[in-house]
């Protein structure tokens, strides 16, 4: 149903033109900001971001944008290397058609293949009031913790 294609100079502008619904604007930064943050994370050595356009494989149409990241060092909450769904969004015009779940399934498959290095966990962070993200991550088997002091929730699954 969906195919993840790396963000390149050919699809860069199409990816940054994607947008979520008005009521979702507070939950996720614009894709151009996400790509800038990915560049900074990569050049600073913090983690390895892997940005992709999400395409409807049958219609060859861009429907969303994701970033899967890899942290070799781990951190306080996940002390071992891990993969993270750093960003996932479906364009406002393409929501409620199964693209988000299909993209998550592709990201899980990719993390299990361990393209950037070994890891035992896949995580995602979302704000506690983002019910759509909570439902999506729970639906694919991620276990959510309690919101932190800033209202962010860490969802984790074994891979």
Predicted regions and their residues:
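Acetyl-CoA-dependent GNAT
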Residues: 2, 6-86, 91-93, 110-114, ...
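Conserved GNAT acetyl-CoA-binding A-motif
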Residues: 113-125
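Short acidic/glycine-enriched loop/turn segments that link adjacent beta-strands
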Residues: 130, 149-153
């Amino acid at each position: 149903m969906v195919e993840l294609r790396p963000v390149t100079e050919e699809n860069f502008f199409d990816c940054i033109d994607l947008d979520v619904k008005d009521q979702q604007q507070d939950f996720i930064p614009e894709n151009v900001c996400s790509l800038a943050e990915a560049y900074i994370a990569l050049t600073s050595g913090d983690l390895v971001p892997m940005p992709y356009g999400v395409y409807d494989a049958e219609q060859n149409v861009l429907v969303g944008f994701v970033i899967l990241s890899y942290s070799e060092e781990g951190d306080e909450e996940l002390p071992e290397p891990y993969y993270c769904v750093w960003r996932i969004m479906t364009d406002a015009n393409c929501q409620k058609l199964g693209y988000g779940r299909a993209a998550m399934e592709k990201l899980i498959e990719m993390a299990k293949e361990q393209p950037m290095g070994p890891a035992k966990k896949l995580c995602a962070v979302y704000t506690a009031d983002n019910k759509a993200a909570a439902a999506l991550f729970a639906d694919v088997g991620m276990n959510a913790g309690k919101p932190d002091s800033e209202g962010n929730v860490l969802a984790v699954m074994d891979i």
